[in-house]
Amino acid sequence: MKKIAVLTSGGDAPGLNACIRAVVRAGHYYNCEVIGVRRGFKGLIEKQFISLTPRDVGGIIDKGGTFLLSAREDRFLEYKYRKIAANNIREEKIDGLFVIGGNGSFQGAYLLSKEFGIPIIGIPKTIDNDTYGTEYTIGFDTAVNNAVDAIDKIRDTSESHERVFVIEVMGRKSGFLALAAGISTGADVTLIPEYPFPMHVIVKSIVDALNRGKKFAIVVVAEGVASAKEIADILNEKLKPFDFGGVRYSVLGYIQRGGSPTSYDRIMASRFGVFAVEEFMRGNRDFMVALENGKILSKPLEVSFGRIKKPDLKDFELNNILTI
């Protein structure tokens, strides 16, 4: 009987519990003992291990967050603490460590493999959808829906008071979330770091809309471009000659990371989790699960390191076409 362990690391994302559930149940289906590691890499260092049965993960597929908890653990940057973690894994006789995480989590786990020979299986999750090597990461669809729901509500106020609203969404240095939310809500301007607009072009877009008789507008901005307040302040100054309700801004913040996962995230998390276990049982090691051209497959873990994943230029052009 093989023994596997699963942890969640880094920022939470909707669908983590669905993925944990899939790993645990697939593990038992293939006659593995399954260990849960609480609080991510911190739990590896402090040996926060719990046994997980199929019943332990019942009723969690619809829950946001991660019932195993997560933490950012700076100690893991130091070799001596990685060695402690590796020794704990060996003492527990764990044959494979399943890491549900993003770029940083994969790089940390990769060191366990290279320095100590710990077999690593990476399952990508982040609402930013910026993990290189996979078209999809767990949590993205729910985050987009959360952002769209909030922007739709703000639009009601924007239209009622004839205001321009600048709405900041998450994504770090990536524009996937902002672009998807912008297209889905019919935003007048969508700003992402990968395809930047000069400020005068942004102002012109809003001015053109006001000149066409429009009295309100929605600007969606990825946090990696600038703060919503900075852009709102500039627009307020530039748009003073126009008769409308002024410019306001809103930062959606952590609401995007929470809540019950969408059906799509539950399905993808389940598929990723089961595929990861099946690949492990076939003898594959040190890989990440990926979605490519609609198919789930495995890639070397290091594929995701140091490379930038960009939104499809066609989607960006689509957004621009639809904002006339």
Swiss-Prot record:
Binding site for ADP: 21-25, 155, 186-188, 212, 214-216
Alphabetical list of SUPFAM superfamilies matching this protein: Phosphofructokinase (SSF53784)
Protein name listed in UniProt: ATP-dependent 6-phosphofructokinase
Chain residues that bind substrate: 126-128, 163, 170-172, 223, 248, 254-257
Subunit structure: Homotetramer.
Keyword list, A-Z: Allosteric enzyme, ATP-binding, Cytoplasm, Glycolysis, Kinase, Magnesium, Metal-binding, Nucleotide-binding, Transferase
Biological process terms in GO annotation: canonical glycolysis; fructose 1,6-bisphosphate metabolic process; fructose 6-phosphate metabolic process
